[in-house]
Design a protein with these regions (language model features):
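RNA pseudouridine synthases
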Residues: 1-126
Length: 126
């Protein structure tokens, strides 16, 4: 759930990220360098209100704070994100893993789990 509306209803964010360990924060940077990693995610806008967009995300890479840093760098901070947003939200961070899937390490069987977000703000806006 992000504040604002992405320019396109679906797309791919491809950025370079630099992790600042003392700050415990990740930044989008313009140039490669020591510690800089490529970060890629695909997104789809599922629903919108006047102020919020409910976004589905598929990570192609899994960097620390990747979703938060990439959306915030585009002035689309996650609702409730006190680290990457200057907005004062009266909610917890609105980042929810709706579905998780992986192959079981012993059996190789595909494992799939899903769960709806809680029925609290901002999820109740949709």
């Amino acid at each position: 759930m992000v504040h604002g509306h992405p320019a396109q209803t679906q797309g791919t964010f491809r950025d370079l990220l630099l992790r600042n360990k003392p700050e415990r924060k990740t930044y989008v940077v313009d140039t490669p360098g020591k510690g800089v990693q490529e970060a890629i995610l695909d997104y789809w806008v599922m629903e919108r209100t006047d102020a919020l967009s409910k976004v589905r995300i598929r990570l192609q890479t899994g960097r620390t704070h990747q979703i938060r840093a990439q959306f915030s760098s585009r002035q689309l901070p996650l609702a409730g994100d006190r680290k990457y947003s200057l907005l004062e939200d009266d909610c917890e961070i609105a980042l929810w893993s709706y579905r998780l899937g992986f192959d079981h390490p012993d059996t190789g069987k595909r494992m799939e789990f899903s769960m709806e977000p809680p029925k609290i703000y901002p999820w109740t806006e949709f």
